[in-house]
């Protein structure tokens, strides 16, 4: 890895290398997703951990008390290190970049599905199965976004391809043809 990388990429790549060496890519994927969920769903937790007004050891104890046994020790050590170097604010970016490295190693492809209404688990599973066949992929991870502005149907973004079957696009194309 190049030495000109930014700290986020260095930390993320180090996490990835540990996961690879330990043969724990799947575990780290799960742990990184867990940390990301905590950051998004319980922001007060990382606000407390990042609060410079709190004693550093107190902040580390908060991490250990709440994450030990749930998250691999190397990831807890990373959080401790970020507390020490006053860079805990980088954690989310590091986690997302490490997930990119891990997903690439696991051959996980992400697909963005935009729909006008909430899809059921069954509908999502069927879409994923169809995409696996169409693109000859074993692992596809769907990201479902509800956007009422597309009116109906759905739009699928997979790598650099867009399959837009939204009602909004269909109507736009009809208007475009009539002009």
Curated annotation (Swiss-Prot):
Keyword DNA-binding: no
Localization per record: Cell membrane
Main location group: membrane
InterPro entries registered for this protein in UniProt: ATP_synth_OSCP/delta_N_sf (IPR026015), ATPase_OSCP/dsu (IPR000711)
GO cellular component: plasma membrane; proton-transporting ATP synthase complex
Keywords: ATP synthesis, Cell membrane, CF(1), Hydrogen ion transport, Ion transport, Membrane, Transport
Topology relative to the membrane: Peripheral membrane protein
Molecular-function GO terms, alphabetical: proton-transporting ATP synthase activity, rotational mechanism
The family this protein is said to belong to: Belongs to the ATPase delta chain family.
Entry-linked PANTHER family: ATP SYNTHASE DELTA CHAIN
NCBIfam families, alphabetized: ATP_synt_delta (TIGR01145)
Known partners and oligomeric status: F-type ATPases have 2 components, F(1) - the catalytic core - and F(0) - the membrane proton channel. F(1) has five subunits: alpha(3), beta(3), gamma(1), delta(1), epsilon(1). F(0) has three main subunits: a(1), b(2) and c(10-14). The alpha and beta chains form an alternating ring which encloses part of the gamma chain. F(1) is attached to F(0) by a central stalk formed by the gamma and epsilon chains, while a peripheral stalk is formed by the delta and b chains.
Biological function: F(1)F(0) ATP synthase produces ATP from ADP in the presence of a proton or sodium gradient. F-type ATPases consist of two structural domains, F(1) containing the extramembraneous catalytic core and F(0) containing the membrane proton channel, linked together by a central stalk and a peripheral stalk. During catalysis, ATP synthesis in the catalytic domain of F(1) is coupled via a rotary mechanism of the central stalk subunits to proton translocation.
Protein name: ATP synthase subunit delta
Species, as recorded: Ureaplasma urealyticum serovar 10 (strain ATCC 33699 / Western)
